[in-house]
């Protein structure tokens, strides 16, 4: 009867295996249910949207760095203005001044205005120098014109004398 008992034991083992198998299937069914929740993961996708919000905050920090670069551009614009001070063309200075005025903070504009008045004084001096130069040049041209017609008159008077 021992073999029968062994078969009965194997039968009970098989029954136990069958009992365990449905439990695994139930777990498998639970695994299939979370897949629709993964499909519902729009709620989970909203959490990465919150992560996307944090890089926007990082962008605002980058804007703070941009203000630092704007200060550097103002200093560069001032350097170009000083470098152009030796140039005769004033049109090259004006765009740099306007760019500097736009970039400077309103508190700094008050400090920048006296500098602009000093530069206007320099412009007035240059225009005065140009006017004096213009006054001298026409005087020289008039003197030359007066001498040339006198020579032409002398030649004309001599030529008809030869023809006669």
Curated annotation (Swiss-Prot):
Membrane-spanning intervals of the chain: none
A single Gene Ontology CC term: nucleus
Record flagged with keyword Ribonucleoprotein: no
Top-level division of the source organism's lineage: Eukaryota
Biased composition (Basic residues): 16-27
Principal subcellular localisation of the protein: nucleus
Compositional bias of kind Basic and acidic residues: 49-61, 69-89, 117-156
The keyword DNA-binding appears for this protein: yes
Keywords: Chromosome, DNA-binding, Nucleus, Phosphoprotein
Protein known as: Histone H1
The species this protein was found in: Tetrahymena thermophila (strain SB210)
Lineage: Eukaryota, Sar, Alveolata, Ciliophora, Intramacronucleata
UniProt gene name: HHO
